[in-house]
């Protein structure tokens, strides 16, 4: 029996991880705790083998004046909770970092992450995550494993990220550019299985899980349109507009540039692919607008 405490109650990732682990109650006992106002200090950490830390401020293109808050929550709070966990006998601390520690691509050049690629954040969200990682590694020892996950974009039912926006567009536009690309993505159930395997195998280190298949914006649009019975014409005639739009609209590079981990970085001695990419898009909610 592995006793797991999730710090960050009611988060999209935390809630899904909890549900996934609780499918096997004979193997996992899971509790959650809020990290607001030091409520987490009231939890008895001595009961737990693993802390899965998901609390943090998300990447939402924040204003510069919010930078101190990002460092306080994403870096300082993370390290404080990890120290507390170590002092109270927790054996493994799993931290949800982000692929954005490498770079937040803002042009059509995109970014391809190799095993040799070094982190180089270009905004304070990525830097706050990287500084948290560095602080955690200083705490690692033989009796306290640090597991850092740098996921690409996570999605799934109930998530309000960019994918539901793209779904809305796919069901409204009559035409779409045939601009194919490669993007690493991670369905929340594949992430949940990955976290489960980290706990079972008691693995420390830095990890780069992703879906077994790269996402392609064109194919995502095609699948959404098909599922919702919407006819759409995908044509290369619109491709020049992608280049033009990328110069003025930040959303265009996010939608059409390449952004992925090479596959070898995401291969481990266990299988965590529980849902295919095409199946993972079925039944996803779409937004009522692009906002």
Could you tell me what each predicted segment is?
Residues 4-21:
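N-terminal Rossmann NAD(P)H-binding glycine-rich loop of SDR-like oxidoreductase domains
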């Amino acid at each position: 029996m592995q006793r797991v405490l999730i710090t960050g109650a009611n988060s999209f990732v935390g809630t899904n991880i909890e549900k996934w682990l609780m499918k096997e109650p004979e193997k996992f006992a899971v509790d959650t705790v809020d990290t607001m106002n030091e409520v987490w200090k009231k939890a008895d950490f001595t009961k737990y083998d693993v802390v899965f830390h998901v609390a943090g401020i998300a990447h939402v293109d924040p204003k510069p004046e919010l930078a101190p808050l990002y460092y306080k929550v994403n870096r300082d709070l993370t390290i404080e909770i990890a120290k507390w966990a170590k002092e109270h006998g927790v054996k493994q601390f799993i931290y949800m970092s982000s692929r954005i520690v490498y770079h937040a691509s803002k042009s059509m050049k995109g970014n391809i992450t190799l095993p040799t690629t070094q982190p180089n954040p270009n905004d304070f969200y990525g830097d706050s995550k990287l500084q948290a990682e560095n602080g955690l590694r200083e705490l690692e020892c033989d009796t306290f494993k640090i597991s850092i996950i740098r996921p690409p974009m996570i999605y799934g039912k109930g998530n309000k990220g960019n994918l539901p926006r793209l779904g809305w567009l796919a069901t409204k536009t009559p035409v779409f550019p045939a601009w194919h690309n490669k993007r690493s993505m991670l369905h929340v159930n594949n992430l949940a299985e990955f976290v489960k395997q980290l706990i079972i195998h008691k693995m420390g280190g830095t990890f780069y899980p992703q879906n077994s298949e790269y996402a392609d914006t064109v194919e995502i649009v095609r699948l959404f349109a098909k599922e919702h019975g919407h006819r759409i014409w995908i044509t290369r005639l619109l491709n020049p507009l992608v280049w033009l739009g990328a110069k003025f609209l930040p959303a265009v590079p996010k939608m059409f540039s390449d952004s992925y981990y090479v596959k070898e970085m995401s291969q481990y001695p266990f299988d965590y692919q529980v849902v295919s990419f095409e199946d993972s898009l079925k039944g996803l909610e779409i937004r009522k607008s692009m906002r």
